[in-house]
């Protein structure tokens, strides 16, 4: 097909079915439950953990399974509007194992001059970019890890998705939203402490987060209705929106 230059600008869309979203956080906080509420979601089940949820899922326990599932989704003969990869960590491990097997090596570093790392990164980038370009929403679930960051003036701890750096950098470049699932504690007037699960959506030195849609406040409850409501409203003015949603 011939390539032509555009004559009109694109129109931003608020539909979650067009967004690529990374959700990460500690175990059992509700990442998969939250993802299951995205429009017409189908899970690529890369690790156990969905037995307590009523969802559409296809087991993808090898990279060949994963690629086959991608091909089925890309064909378009289905009712789904959102692809959920649960978890991205296991998907990357399968990708690495597949590439290593093809080149008859045990570890990515076994090939000279960094070729093993490059082969894995290229395959990872190729497949994720293809998925993100499909006309569906894409939700990527990852675990969280605390990493020590050293600077010239000191060091600090940053919470980030538990992917290797080479895999994480590919993902961060693709997504529209990076949602960090966290908890906050509140103490009432009687001294009773309660814990609330929240989403952090804006960049911060101590955790990875981001929202290029401009529709989310800094923090909001880990509640899909509260999250989805933001996509039925105008974009958020981040200069005036505070943490009022978390009370």
List the predicted regions and their residue ranges:
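Conserved P-loop
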Residues: 2-96
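A general structural signal for short secondary-structure junctions and capping/turn motifs
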Residues: 13-14, 33-35, 130-131, 168-172, ...
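An acidic- and aromatic-residue-enriched active-site/binding cleft used to recognize and process polar
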Residues: 26, 88, 143-144, 183
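Short, well-ordered beta-strand core segments
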Residues: 41-43, 138, 178-180
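Conserved, well-folded catalytic cores of nucleic-acid-processing
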Residues: 72-76, 94, 130, 170, ...
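Long, low-complexity, intrinsically disordered polar/charged segments
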Residues: 74-112, 175, 227-228, 232
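P-loop NTPase motor core
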Residues: 90-169
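Conserved GTP-binding G-domain of TRAFAC-class P-loop NTPases and closely related GTPase folds
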Residues: 146-247
